[in-house]
Amino acid sequence: MSPPAGARRSLGPVALVVAGGLSVQFGAAVAVLLMPRAGALGVVTLRLVLAALVLFVVCRPRLRGHSRADWATVITFGAAMGGMNMLFYQAVDRIPLGAAVTLEVLGPLALSVIASRRLVNLLWAALALAGVVLLGGGGFDRLDPVGAAFALAAGGMWAAYIIFSARTGRRFPQADGLALAMGFGALLSLPFGLAEAGSRLFVPSTLGLGLAVALMSSVLPYTLELLALRRLPAATFAVLMSLEPAIAAAAGFLLLSQALSPSEGLAIVLVVVASMGAVRTQAAGKRAPAG
């Protein structure tokens, strides 16, 4: 028996978020492998510039006919995107990928608590928070404090990204807003990347890996998330982001040989349960009769 149409509609945007998470975290693992060649900021520049070029070619966004409010929204979205990437890549250059994402996801979780209007959503956020703390294995005090600070700051920018991604999706057709925001984020990162990596950015093999990172970590996931945010409330989307540490841990294990401990495995179970609970709550809220 096929699932009801309402269930399919509620699962659709959730599947987009999960697919985007898989793409971005495996792309991040590839980026870590690229950092010895181009540096953290150089990788960010390659990722954003190449992703912006791809999106401009594919989407051909319209530059005229937008209001000042439209431009303010898309520029803020681009600044949040660029800042989030620069801060996060500085973090993973200093601390393990799983720990960096664990700290970063606290930003979306805080947004979930603030944006939630239902008490049960606070429960899912608390459960996910317990999971991401457990995923750290109680070893955050042994992390490079600068790297941990970068990851936490990236989490704040991630929360801003969620808010302005949703607003951009409502103001711009298709992926036009994403393409424009990516272009602004690329311009923001360009002087930092050139200062750190210089001519190393233009080595053909580095450009090839940079394109892979751009497609996996920017073009595909941001497009999927932008589509999902048109149909998901910000609070539900933010709790779904708690899947990111679990995905990052898997990517770190498969590509970077970072093994999981039993406590980290339990943490993954907690964040998955929290995410599933958030999905069920969102679907139940849509089915509830008004009045």
Residue positions per predicted region:
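Transmembrane alpha-helices of multi-pass small-molecule transport proteins
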Residues: P13-V14, M35-G83, A110-L111, M157-F164, ...
